[in-house]
């Protein structure tokens, strides 16, 4: 009995410690719907998945800690469906939620282009109605899995000049199983068969987690992926842009938090001596206190 009591007290102490660390970490929720969907987590699931169908299942499994969205406020987490928009060797995999019987809302889109026989690039872009602005995330380039990208052509080996606009050293995702799958000759574009109140039998909605519980679960995804400000996959983005789907319900319900985010997040860019570009980004917390300030310097070559 004494051993059981000690184990119980130890478990309670550990739980309290985890909760306290999350609350005292200084990381505040933005109040945006995007707080509850991990773009980095979605990319990790896509990297693991064997196909778009498998990817859809992975992002909707509770224990994978990718999705915690409740866009319509019904108290249950939403099911995220995947729809592949294809034009030749360009793919735009749309991640979308059925908000009601008549409305859908795009959460993000994974844009993919094949740039060579054994080269492909991708980015995931969070929707501005969900994240307050377009948030672009891509795999971090790694030695042996990266190549120089020059707006559509590829060159092996590093290059210090490949840094402006679409050019750069990017991760090659050609060996990801799901990427190979969608470029197979027999592939038929995946269009999720599920819709409002019609979901797969394996999926059961759960109650959304509170921020202090949810956030520690998703931070583990952030290291292999980076947030960038450059659209590299421009052909896929051009295909997706006119097909973007938004919901009036989501826009109305979250308009205040989205507008507040856009007002409090300021960006200042100016050009210094020698053509040096300096960008300063300031984000203010919901309580009006300064959350963070980042300055990026890019020198013209």
Q: Which functions belong to the PLM regions below?
A:
Residues 24-44:
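Short N-terminal segments immediately surrounding and downstream of signal-peptide cleavage
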Residues 58-68, 92-97:
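N-terminal post-signal-peptidase region of extra-cytosolic proteins
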Residues 87-88, 109:
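Beta-strand-dominated extracellular/periplasmic modules and repeats
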Residues 1-4, 9, 259-301:
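Extracytoplasmic low-complexity, disordered linker/stalk tracts in cell-surface/secreted proteins
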Residues 1-24, 208:
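Bacterial Sec-dependent N-terminal signal peptides
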Residues 38-61:
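Extracellular/luminal recognition modules and glycoprotein regions
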Residues 99-274:
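Low-complexity segments
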Residues 67-79:
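Acidic, glycine-anchored loop motifs typical of Ca2+
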């Amino acid at each position: 009995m004494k051993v059981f009591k000690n184990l119980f007290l130890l478990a309670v102490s550990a739980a309290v410690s985890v909760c306290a660390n999350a609350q005292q970490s200084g990381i505040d929720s933005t109040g945006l719907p995007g707080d509850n969907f991990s773009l980095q987590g979605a990319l990790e699931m896509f990297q693991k998945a064997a196909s778009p169908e498998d990817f859809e299942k992975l992002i909707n499994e509770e224990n994978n800690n990718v999705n915690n969205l409740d866009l319509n406020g019904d108290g249950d987490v939403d099911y995220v469906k995947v729809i592949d928009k294809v034009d030749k060797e360009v793919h735009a995999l749309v991640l979308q939620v059925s908000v009601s019987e008549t409305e859908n809302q795009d959460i993000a889109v994974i844009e993919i282009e094949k740039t060579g026989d054994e080269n492909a690039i991708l980015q995931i872009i969070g929707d501005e109605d969900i994240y307050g602005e377009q948030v672009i995330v891509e795999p971090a380039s790694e030695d042996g899995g990266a190549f120089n990208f020059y707006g559509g052509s590829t060159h092996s080996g590093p290059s210090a000049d490949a840094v402006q606009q679409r050019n750069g050293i990017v991760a090659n995702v050609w060996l990801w199983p799901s990427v190979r799958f969608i470029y197979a000759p027999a592939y038929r574009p995946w269009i999720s068969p599920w819709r409002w109140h019609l979901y797969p039998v394996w999926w059961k909605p759960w109650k959304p987690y509170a921020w202090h519980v949810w956030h520690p679960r998703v931070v583990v995804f952030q290291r292999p992926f980076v947030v960038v400000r450059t659209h590299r996959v421009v052909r896929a983005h051009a295909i997706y842009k006119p097909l973007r789907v938004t919901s009036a319900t989501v826009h109305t319900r979250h308009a205040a938090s989205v507008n507040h985010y856009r007002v409090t997040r300021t960006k200042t860019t100016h050009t210094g001596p020698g053509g040096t570009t300096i960008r300063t980004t300031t984000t203010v917390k919901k309580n009006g206190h300064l959350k963070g300030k980042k300055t990026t310097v890019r020198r013209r070559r």
